[in-house]
Amino acid sequence: MNAFDADITEHADSSGCHPLFRDVPATVEFNKLRKRLVRLTRQAIEDFAMVKPGDRWMVCLSGGKDSYGLLALLLDLKWRGLLPVELLAVNLDQGQPNFPKHILPDFLTRYGIEHRIEYQDTYSIVTDKLPETSTYCSLCSRLRRGNLYRIAREEGCSAIVLGHHREDILETFFMNLFHGGRLAAMPPKLLNDEGDLMVFRPLAYAAEDDLEKFANAMQFPIIPCDLCGSQDGLQRNAMKAMLIDIEKRMPGRKDTMIRALTNVRPSHLLDRKLFDFAGLMANGEKGSDDALW
């Protein structure tokens, strides 16, 4: 048992668990999965210094497996006394056709989770401005972001918490590499342009497969992500397929890639803004030529 797992066990509440977890499968497999996800979530929170005791976090809930998992894991940590912040679950209903409006309020109320459901018909704005053949995701996400910032301020929240996981980060990295000509991924911690709100991604280390298994075991009432009829762009789908193929042929590569994003060596890249190549001069001292040849 490592330090994270030991702390999780030690801090378990005497009443057992958050109401969300009272009817979960009593299997070794689920317990291992839950413990792994809790550990990785807590590790990301600690690695990137997300917690300021007494803060109020706005947890964005779309109804997909990732955001449900995020909310459940944060509630689990808070129940154990390992996350000293307030949590507010927020869903932004963007007016997509056939959106089942009752699912999230019913779920959140049933488990006594503080929440806010906000209706803003951004779907009509998107469909009015873009042709039917376009992918709506980019404009839709910009409109959603603006509304989420507004809601966070209205609710006195210090941070917006999103459910992006390991695969989201890697896909974004390769999209930027192949199509943007830059080395960049999704930051686990970000300060917004106005400087008044943080954006956190506590699932940065969590695997999508684990989150899917977790959602199935927890029997979350999943809302499909294709209600608007638009799908993510071809570029992201291609990156997802590439990563699946790499992991299939060389198991464990996704974990290696995530570790690589935490182990950057600017002197071994070509960005003159990150390393002073012009000021690098021989002075008779030994340098490091690892991997240079």
Swiss-Prot record:
<keyword id="KW-0963">Cytoplasm</keyword>
<keyword id="KW-0460">Magnesium</keyword>
<dbReference type="GO" id="GO:0034227">
    <property type="term" value="P:tRNA thio-modification"/>
</dbReference>
<dbReference type="GO" id="GO:0000287">
    <property type="term" value="F:magnesium ion binding"/>
</dbReference>
<feature type="binding site">
    <location>
        <position position="228"/>
    </location>
    <ligand>
        <name>[4Fe-4S] cluster</name>
    </ligand>
</feature>
<dbReference type="InterPro" id="IPR035107">
    <property type="entry name" value="tRNA_thiolation_TtcA_Ctu1"/>
</dbReference>
<keyword id="KW-0547">Nucleotide-binding</keyword>
<dbReference type="InterPro" id="IPR011063">
    <property type="entry name" value="TilS/TtcA_N"/>
</dbReference>
<dbReference type="GO" id="GO:0005524">
    <property type="term" value="F:ATP binding"/>
</dbReference>
<dbReference type="GO" id="GO:0000049">
    <property type="term" value="F:tRNA binding"/>
</dbReference>
<keyword id="KW-0479">Metal-binding</keyword>
<dbReference type="InterPro" id="IPR014729">
    <property type="entry name" value="Rossmann-like_a/b/a_fold"/>
</dbReference>
<feature type="binding site">
    <location>
        <position position="137"/>
    </location>
    <ligand>
        <name>[4Fe-4S] cluster</name>
    </ligand>
</feature>
<comment type="pathway">
    <text>tRNA modification.</text>
</comment>
<comment type="subunit">
    <text>Homodimer.</text>
</comment>
<dbReference type="GO" id="GO:0005737">
    <property type="term" value="C:cytoplasm"/>
</dbReference>
<protein>
    <recommendedName>
        <fullName>tRNA-cytidine(32) 2-sulfurtransferase</fullName>
        <ecNumber>2.8.1.-</ecNumber>
    </recommendedName>
</protein>
<keyword id="KW-0808">Transferase</keyword>
<dbReference type="InterPro" id="IPR012089">
    <property type="entry name" value="tRNA_Cyd_32_2_STrfase"/>
</dbReference>
<comment type="function">
    <text>Catalyzes the ATP-dependent 2-thiolation of cytidine in position 32 of tRNA, to form 2-thiocytidine (s(2)C32). The sulfur atoms are provided by the cysteine/cysteine desulfurase (IscS) system.</text>
</comment>
<keyword id="KW-0411">Iron-sulfur</keyword>
<keyword id="KW-0004">4Fe-4S</keyword>
<dbReference type="Pfam" id="PF01171">
    <property type="entry name" value="ATP_bind_3"/>
</dbReference>
<comment type="similarity">
    <text>Belongs to the TtcA family.</text>
</comment>
<dbReference type="GO" id="GO:0051539">
    <property type="term" value="F:4 iron, 4 sulfur cluster binding"/>
</dbReference>
<feature type="short sequence motif" description="PP-loop motif">
    <location>
        <begin position="62"/>
        <end position="67"/>
    </location>
</feature>
<keyword id="KW-0819">tRNA processing</keyword>
<keyword id="KW-0067">ATP-binding</keyword>
<keyword id="KW-0820">tRNA-binding</keyword>
<keyword id="KW-0408">Iron</keyword>
<keyword id="KW-0694">RNA-binding</keyword>
<feature type="binding site">
    <location>
        <position position="140"/>
    </location>
    <ligand>
        <name>[4Fe-4S] cluster</name>
    </ligand>
</feature>
<dbReference type="GO" id="GO:0016783">
    <property type="term" value="F:sulfurtransferase activity"/>
</dbReference>
